[in-house]
From Swiss-Prot:
This is Phosphatidylglycerol--prolipoprotein diacylglyceryl transferase. GO terms for biological process: lipoprotein biosynthetic process. A 1,2-diacyl-sn-glycero-3-phospho-(1'-sn-glycerol) binds at R167. It is a multi-pass membrane protein. It comes from Deinococcus radiodurans (strain ATCC 13939 / DSM 20539 / JCM 16871 / CCUG 27074 / LMG 4051 / NBRC 15346 / NCIMB 9279 / VKM B-1422 / R1). It is an enzyme of class 2 (transferase). It comes from the Bacteria. The lineage of its organism: Bacteria, Thermotogati, Deinococcota, Deinococci, Deinococcales.
């Protein structure tokens, strides 16, 4: 495969995302909040793909810049980034399929295989993408006998920018990462122009905890989900911005691995404690659920929240080890007594 083959494959998968939601001849002026960025005939470019790739491109450029400044092998790191993107995307889709198998149950073989690889209706997991990227980096570090953490640290800003772009794309898609119904003042009413959101949320959901169709009414000749919800997509954007800003300070430390494990710690805390708490996801271990027009819109525990607990503990332990190692390696200057 050519050097940029993984990048092109990733882009091709992203740009078509959400194409099935928009009819041919669609124009952006008619639907300001539409998944489709551009449509030419049957060729569709989705906002999700455009925004995510812009975020990744920013991180790609910054990572190479940092690699050159630190005297690392920038050409090799560029190859790493491209393959990390490719296998990260594969991991993101694979984890989504495994954790959302109920979507694919009952689909006959071999059609189910086509549905698994079909990204037009969305479905990726950020944690799966991170795992795929980390495994790729481990492979390169072992093959070329590199310090894994020196290169892993440089990928942190790119991941943060990718989160920002992806969550902005989720806003345009409408039906992705939706929040729970809430009576808090922070509740967001989706505009009538966000047809993908209203059409998606007004379809009956077999899971009563996730069924918002009871809040749907006809307004101005259009079906609309009228209840306020947590704007969890925006929460995700803010989390990405926080991580991007924080990575600037984490990378000031020359201790390899410091930025890498700080990212895992704070992404897990913010994602599980903030975004996921208010997000309309299935509750794997249902210990608390309080949602509705007179409720805060909180649910515990989702798959992501459960998975984040060991990640937080491991990250804290690794950061403690790095701090201890740094204290041991700092040379001490002997104090000479004056006679």
């Amino acid at each position: 495969m050519p050097r940029r083959g993984p990048f092109l494959a990733l882009f091709a998968g992203c740009v078509s995302r959400g194409a099935s939601r928009s009819p041919p001849g669609h124009t952006l002026t008619r639907r300001p909040m539409d998944p489709v960025f551009l449509q030419i005939g049957n060729f569709t470019i989705a906002w999700y793909g455009v925004l995510m790739m812009l975020g990744i491109a920013a991180g790609y450029w910054l990572g190479l810049k940092l690699a050159r400044e630190r005297g690392l092998n920038a050409d090799l790191f560029e190859r790493m980034i491209l393959w990390m993107l490719f296998w990260g995307f594969v991991g993101a889709r694979l984890v989504f399929v495994l954790t959302s198998w109920h979507i694919f149950e009952g689909i006959p073989f071999p059609r189910v295989l086509l549905d698994i690889v079909n990204l037009r209706n969305g479905g990726i997991s950020i944690h799966g993408g991170l795992i795929g990227g980390v495994l790729t980096l481990i492979y390169f570090a072992r093959r070329y006998r590199l310090n894994f953490y020196q290169y892993a640290d440089l990928a942190v800003p790119g991941v943060a920018f990718g989160i920002i772009g992806g969550r902005l794309g989720n806003i345009m898609n409408g039906t992705d990462t939706v929040g729970r119904v809430t009576g808090w003042p922070i509740g967001y009413h989706w505009p009538a122009s966000a047809r993908a959101f209203h059409e998606g949320m007004c379809r009956p959901n077999p899971n009563p905890d996730m069924d918002l169709s009871k809040y749907c009414h006809e307004v101005g000749g259009q079906i609309m989900m009228t209840a306020p919800v947590h704007f969890t997509q925006l929460y995700g954007v803010i989390i990405g911005i926080i991580l991007a800003v924080a990575s600037y300070f984490w990378l000031k430390s020359r201790v390899p691995g410091w930025a890498f494990w700080q990212f895992w710690l704070w992404y897990s805390i913010l994602r599980a404690g903030w975004e996921e708490t208010f997000r309309l996801n299935p509750l794997t271990i249902k210990t608390y659920l309080n949602q509705g027009l007179d409720a805060p819109g909180i649910g515990l525990w989702t798959d992501t929240q459960i998975f984040s607990v060991p990640l937080i503990l491991v990250s804290l332990w690794m950061l403690w080890r790095l701090r201890q190692r740094r204290q041991v390696t700092v040379p001490t200057v002997p104090v000479q007594s004056q006679s």
